[in-house]
């Protein structure tokens, strides 16, 4: 929006409403221009305490207030299927619901937690680790630890930290395939189990691991630079990545505990990362 304001103000002047991608599908289905709470909370334009668009931020950026649509709670009715779609598909009127547009919050709804205080870990290419709160925590400590407050189902706050996930494993596997060594993820886990434990650690969030490419070589260079044993075999590299991720999760949990003042007995893990028995076990350890 700020780019448009500075470089293509003519487009912004013609805009009626800003509709985020998940809300666009609801608009196509119903004709209603609404903003679902969870996806709106990811824009940095939401007041986390009020659950409304932040007039303070919008005014500071000099953005037109009229383009921001009404925010609707997650899990509530947006509208009904349009007459045109009903006729085309031969359907009766159907309610269209505002499901959690933010995929992490959608996954979190499925967490089978019975206790009030728990840690969730949504693990895929990225990992998101956090807890649910009734109210946001916005202070110097949460800012220092770079922990965010995102909106969720039932008006709850997901107090969470973004961490790299299985990206390093995925990119390492692609590199080995380029080198003529193609292994399935199950094969990589078997090799990792046979490698020595707690030999070396990387910071998975270090900037050198973000670009695609030869991640195994970057891991070895990181270990040399930090005075650690260097993982040479494929199994050693995979074990290093998994143990480093588990250690990163532990570190993030300690930061969340420090901010909330709560103790957590249970971690619920969801997402594609749960298919890795090795990562699940290291995380539990």
List each model region and its residues.
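Conserved short loop/turn motifs at secondary-structure junctions
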Residues: 41-46, 72-76
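Active-site core segments that coordinate phosphate-bearing ligands/cofactors
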Residues: 2-34, 45-55, 59-60, 83-267, ...
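A conserved helix-loop-beta module that forms one wall/lid of the active-site cleft
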Residues: 61-74
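Short, surface-exposed acidic/glycine-rich loop or hinge patches that mediate macromolecular interfaces
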Residues: 76, 273-274
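Nucleotide/phosphate-binding loop and acidic/charged catalytic motifs
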Residues: 35-40
């Amino acid at each position: 929006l700020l780019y448009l304001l500075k470089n293509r103000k003519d487009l912004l002047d013609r805009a009626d409403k800003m509709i985020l991608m998940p809300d666009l599908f609801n608009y196509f289905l119903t004709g209603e221009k609404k903003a679902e709470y969870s996806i709106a909370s990811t824009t940095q334009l939401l007041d986390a305490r009020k659950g409304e668009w932040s007039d303070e931020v919008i005014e500071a950026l000099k953005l037109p207030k009229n383009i921001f649509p009404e925010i609707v709670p997650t899990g509530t009715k947006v509208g009904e299927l349009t007459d045109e779609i009903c006729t085309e598909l031969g359907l009766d009127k159907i309610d269209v619901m505002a499901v959690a547009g933010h995929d992490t919050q959608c996954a979190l709804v499925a967490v089978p937690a019975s206790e009030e205080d728990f840690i969730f870990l949504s693990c895929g290419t990225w990992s998101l680790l956090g807890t649910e709160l009734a109210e946001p925590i916005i202070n110097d400590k949460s800012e220092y630890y770079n922990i965010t407050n995102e909106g969720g189902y039932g008006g709850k706050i997901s107090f969470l930290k973004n961490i790299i996930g299985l990206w390093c494993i995925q990119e390492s596997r692609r590199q080995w395939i380029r080198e003529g060594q193609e292994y399935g993820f199950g094969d990589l886990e078997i090799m990792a189990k046979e490698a020595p434990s707690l030999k070396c650690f990387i910071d998975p969030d270090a900037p050198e691991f973000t670009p695609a490419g030869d991640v195994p070589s970057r891991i070895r260079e990181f270990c040399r630079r930090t005075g650690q044993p260097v993982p040479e075999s494929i199994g050693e590299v995979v074990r290093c990545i998994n143990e480093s991720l588990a250690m990163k999760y532990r570190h993030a949990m300690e930061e969340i505990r420090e901010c909330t003042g709560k103790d957590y007995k249970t971690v619920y893990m969801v997402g594609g990362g749960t298919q890795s028995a090795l990562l699940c076990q290291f995380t539990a350890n």
